[in-house]
Amino acid sequence: MHIVHTIAELRQQLSGFKRPAFVPTMGNLHEGHIALVRQARPLGDVTVSSIFVNRLQFAPHEDFDSYPRTLDADAERLEAAGCDVVFAPREKDLYPEPQTFKVHPATDLSDILEGHFRPGFFIGVSTVVMKLFSCVFAGMPTGVAAFGKKDYQQVMVVRRLVQQFALPIEILAGETQRAEDGLALSSRNSYLSPAERQEAVHLSRALRALGEAARAATGQPDLAALESQALQALARRGWKPDYLTVRRRADLAPPQGALADVPLVVLGAAKLGNTRLIDNLEI
């Protein structure tokens, strides 16, 4: 396995290949990332993973500076998973000058949910994804890129980006990997204290309960009331929830009318202590 830091080094390593399988990450890897590498690997002729903590998607008050940087351990895990090339650019490598050209995704998808509570987040995500795609796939006839469904809205934004720019890239959405108690694996789980780690599973349980209540309702359910009850129940446990909501899988819009035949997803984000966690469940 090769570890490279510059775009020129990356392209040199990829010369001669025609279909990269790419897994972008911010490092501090867990089994969810490794599962994506294993799923993507058979779909390309070379497997690439990037490790880059992207400043553009962090607000000034968020955890950019404290986000764990664990390159050596991450590289060991990626090599064991069969990764061929690790692209670990420094900030000066990916952004040698201020990134004044940015990708602004459609507001109907990017200004809701995560985008509402983290303004500018999806601009930062879309910009770095487009830049990484340019680094990995430039000159390639086709390729595949893998993202985890835990970041459900992000996957949808990336799919729209690929569609709108006619990029010859297949997007693979990997299922959320969970701990035995149901907690979605996340790099930020490492912030949790032992007591918070025990409590953290209640986010996925709240989403499951909300989804079951929505599906059990006959006719046109009062989703606002069900969502409010779910928020209050989580808050009583000491959480600070941003949202717990039922949305259509197709576009993340609130469903209208009866829900019987509508593919839905329940999404949630809440802060436990100083750690903000997100999760979702398709129902």
From Swiss-Prot:
Identify the EC number(s).
6.3.2.1
Membrane spanning stretches? none
Residues annotated as binding beta-alanine are 57
Query: Which cysteine-cysteine pairs are annotated as disulfide bonds in the entry?
Result: none
InterPro entries registered for this protein in UniProt: Pantoate_ligase, Pantoate_ligase_C, Rossmann-like_a/b/a_fold
Q: Which PANTHER family did the record assign? A: CYTIDYLATE KINASE/PANTOATE-BETA-ALANINE LIGASE, PANTOATE--BETA-ALANINE LIGASE
Q: Share what the entry says about its subunit structure, partners included.
A: Homodimer.
Name by which UniProt lists this protein: Pantothenate synthetase
